[in-house]
């Protein structure tokens, strides 16, 4: 029995080794994070199907309670049986991929075992399917929660599935005496090995995922810290002063030898190694930077030749160069240089890419602000382009606090913040946007607010289907929702509700935002939306600005209508209905 235990341990070691190799392949890691998708399930079926065949063909031949051979077998004699790790592969496939993956892998494994033959070979097809259903059930529960079974739970399930296997051997045998002899010899080693193998398999998966999450958390924290300190500079545009200030901060906080920022032609700043010949106000001298500007794609160099600096004494041996964009056009580059090309990591590349995206957004916002001031409708444009700095820094601080607690949630909120800024930028370019885009902007804003104040409020939408393509002024619903959150519920932490209603009213679009808050004082009701007020919670300037935009675009008939009592406040307006499809048609005709 001890000899059997050692031989089975060798077989489990082979499967575990393959699992470890797979978990260090980026494609497999991505697939594991998308287990609920059929594409990933199909790939898991292929992988575990191969594992199950390896488990079958590397089994140990048993006959009359003795080990006959541990060679690779394709066929067994009619009286022989086999001890293998087939149950392990089926069980783990179910715990990871769910019932469908497990059942198909179980059928593949069972048919493979049936092909090998031996005593009561059909029994193993039946047991494979039963084990697949049981392990798949437990796997389905964790997939719904986007988690994995604990190591302890996996070990218990591994033992249970092997016990079920032994039960099937005894239940479906044609020779009970032979089955009892077989089970008494293989049961204990196989139960222990299967339980241990399942636990080790899950340990590899969980430890790899934890390591990835920790790395993402560190990366996100680094990006946020750098973004928080460098954001003010790029709002003024891509120039020598802003580039110099940002590069100094990046060099201080990152493990790089030099930092450079360029526009499309000239070096704006270069700080660190190589600054004796990589000089600001001179033309770009590296071939790598020119390639990035031309292609618009991130590039990495691991040699001096790859960088393309032709100075004979240049100390730079590696570089990461990322394009900076303004309105989908390359405006310059952000460059990280290294004097040791062996320390360039994937995390450095991701960090550079993330910073470049944030800097590009800030450059776009800054340019939009400058352009807005030059337009005839500067007042409306500037109102639309406003991004509350307090809201932004509060959002950054909230995400920073979540990074080490829940990195996945922090990542989602960072995406929402990016969406929020993108919507602000789009709003700065247009007097109107579709209702659908406005609701996406509201959703991005609410995600960030809910992160700061969990379960503080609920929002309900009643949107007519025919209104989805309607054109409305940017931020109109967001401002009204934000106003309710900030003012209506300031003294109450629960049972707060906001209702957003958009419907057709004759030829106009009716927009209404209602809350069940404390209401507006009667002495302020007539002035809200027209003049600023003195208050500890705000001045009402957002509603004044919104009212000016509405009346400026559509006339006084579209001014805000505010009704308030102690049971809540309703703010509504009527604007002429115009469809984005109609607008697109008119533009096509005018061309």
UniProtKB/Swiss-Prot annotation:
Q: Where are the transmembrane segments?
A: 4-26, 45-67, 87-109, 122-139, 154-176, 183-205
Which parts of the sequence belong to the Histidine kinase domain?
A: 363-579
A GO molecular function assigned to this protein is: phosphorelay sensor kinase activity
Q: Which residues carry this modification: Phosphohistidine?
A: 390
Q: Which reaction does it catalyse?
A: ATP + protein L-histidine = ADP + protein N-phospho-L-histidine
The cross-references to Gene3D superfamilies, in alphabetical order and at most eight, read: 1.10.1760.20, 3.30.450.40, Histidine kinase-like ATPase, C-terminal domain
Cellular compartments per GO CC: plasma membrane
EC number(s): the record gives 2.7.13.3
| Biological function | Member of the two-component regulatory system LytR/LytS that probably regulates genes involved in cell wall metabolism.
* Protein name, as recorded: Sensor protein LytS
As recorded in Swiss-Prot or TrEMBL, the protein's gene is named lytS
């Amino acid at each position: 029995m001890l000899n059997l235990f050692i031989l089975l341990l060798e077989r489990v070691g082979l499967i575990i080794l393959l699992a470890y190799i797979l978990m260090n392949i980026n494609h497999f890691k991505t697939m594991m994070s998308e287990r609920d998708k059929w594409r990933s399930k199909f790939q898991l079926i292929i992988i575990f199907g191969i594992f199950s065949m390896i488990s079958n063909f590397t089994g140990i031949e048993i006959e009359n309670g003795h080990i006959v051979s541990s060679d690779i077998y394709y066929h067994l004699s009619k009286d022989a049986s086999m001890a293998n790790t087939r149950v392990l592969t089926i069980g783990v496939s179910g715990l990871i991929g769910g019932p469908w993956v497990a059942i198909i892998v179980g059928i593949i494994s069972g048919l493979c075992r049936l092909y090998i033959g031996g005593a009561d070979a059909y029994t193993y097809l039946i047991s494979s399917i039963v084990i697949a259903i049981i392990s798949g059930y437990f796997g389905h529960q964790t997939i719904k929660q986007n988690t994995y079974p604990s190591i302890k739970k996996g070990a218990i399930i591994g033992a249970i599935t092997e016990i079920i296997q032994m039960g099937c051997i005894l239940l479906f045998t044609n020779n009970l005496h032979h089955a009892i002899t077989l089970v008494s010899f293989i049961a204990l080693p196989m139960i222990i090995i299967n339980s241990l193998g399942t636990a080790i398999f899950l340990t590899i998966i969980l430890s790899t995922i934890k390591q990835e999450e920790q790395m993402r958390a560190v990366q996100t924290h680094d990006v946020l810290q750098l973004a928080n300190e460098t954001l003010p500079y790029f709002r003024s545009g891509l120039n020598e002063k802003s580039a110099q200030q940002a590069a100094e901060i990046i060099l201080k906080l990152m493990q790089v030898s030099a930092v450079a920022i360029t526009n499309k032609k000239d070096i704006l700043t270069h700080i660190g190694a190589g600054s004796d010949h990589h000089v600001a106000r001179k033309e770009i001298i590296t071939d790598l930077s020119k390639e990035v500007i031309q292609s618009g794609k991130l590039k990495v160099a691991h040699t001096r030749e790859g960088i393309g600096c032709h100075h004979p004494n240049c100390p730079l041996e590696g570089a990461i160069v990322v394009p900076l964009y303004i309105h989908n056009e390359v405006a310059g580059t952000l460059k990280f240089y290294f004097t040791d090309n062996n320390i360039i990591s994937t995390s450095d590349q991701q960090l550079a890419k993330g910073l470049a995206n944030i800097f590009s957004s800030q450059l776009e916002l800054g340019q939009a602000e400058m352009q807005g001031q030059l337009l005839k409708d500067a007042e409306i444009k500037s109102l639309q382009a406003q991004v509350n700095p307090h809201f932004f820094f509060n959002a950054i601080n909230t995400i920073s606090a979540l990074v080490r607690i829940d990195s996945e949630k922090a990542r989602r909120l960072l995406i929402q913040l990016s969406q929020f800024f993108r919507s602000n930028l789009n709003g700065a370019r247009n007097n109107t946007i579709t209702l659908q885009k406005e609701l996406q902007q509201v959703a991005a804003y609410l995600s960030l607010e809910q992160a700061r104040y969990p379960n503080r409020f609920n929002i309900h939408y009643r949107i007519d289907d025919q209104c989805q393509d309607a054109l409305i002024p940017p931020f109109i619903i967001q401002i009204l929702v934000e106003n309710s959150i900030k003012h209506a519920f300031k003294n109450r932490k629960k049972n707060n509700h906001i209702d957003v209603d958009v419907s057709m009213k004759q030829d106009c679009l009716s927009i209404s935002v209602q809350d069940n808050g404390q209401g507006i004082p009667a002495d302020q009701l007539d002035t809200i939306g027209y003049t600023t007020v003195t208050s500890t919670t705000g001045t009402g300037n957002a509603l004044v600005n919104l009212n000016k935009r509405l009346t400026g675009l559509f006339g006084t008939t579209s001014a805000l209508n505010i009704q308030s009592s102690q049971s809540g406040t309703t703010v509504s307006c009527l604007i002429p209905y115009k469809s984005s499809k109609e607008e697109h048609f008119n533009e096509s005709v005018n061309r």
